[in-house]
Amino acid sequence: MIDFTFEATAFLTNIVCYFYEIKAFMSKYFLISSAFLLLILGCSSSRDLSDLSVDERLASAIKLFEDEDFEDASIEFEALLLQYPGSSIVDDAQYYLGRCKFEREEFILSAFEFSKLIKNMPASEFVADAQFMLAESYYELSPDYTLDQKYSKKAIEEYQAFVDFFPLNERVAEAERKISELNDKLAQKEYSIAVIYEKMDYYTASLKYYDAVVEIYHDTQYAPMSMYRKIKLLMDREREDEALKEMTKFVRMYPEDKNFNEIEGLKNSLEAKLKGGFSSN
């Protein structure tokens, strides 16, 4: 019993000593790590900005941006916005902060920063550029046509606002081109849904989506494709009167389409048939 007590006491003593050794090691490790971290932070903020004017600090931050040091530039612009909220350089800082977020591919954040400038500083010289970059942010967020297209729609909305408010801006042509590109993507999504419904024999739903493409996205490549498939579907369903109406619209609206000759031939044949009183409707 005595030996057991002695051994147990020795064991517990060793455990306690080991615990204090670990504690001492961790304390030393924490102090070393803290010192190392402070050293890094000290080096990263070694530039003394305390004697610089607001304009000089802005110039320094812009220089960081131009040198593509977007992380440090972003920190500087945020600091300027916090420290000098009523200064004349606020819109500069706000705009470049948005640009930093955009260059870092933080597109949701860049959209937020550009929106703040447009909303809070409507008289700023940066509003036109901010409006374009807001649209660009949503454009970058626009996914493949198979996915949800909310950002595509937001991008179209913001590009259109840019075109409407700044019609003489040199970037209007680019904005219009991207509106067309995004509309094409939206049309492709609707068209693909129509095709899926058609393959599943949900003809009413399919026709509805084909009509939507023609009506809403009439200036995209998917409009004549949708009308063509609608005509073929109506003919397959023996709805000849309706098919003829669509054929008439097709040859009037899409004379340059690759399917024009086929549809014109079908139209002529169907007209002759219906005039002879052989309509199946």
Placement of each model-derived feature along the sequence:
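Sec-dependent bacterial lipoprotein signal peptides
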Residues: 3-43
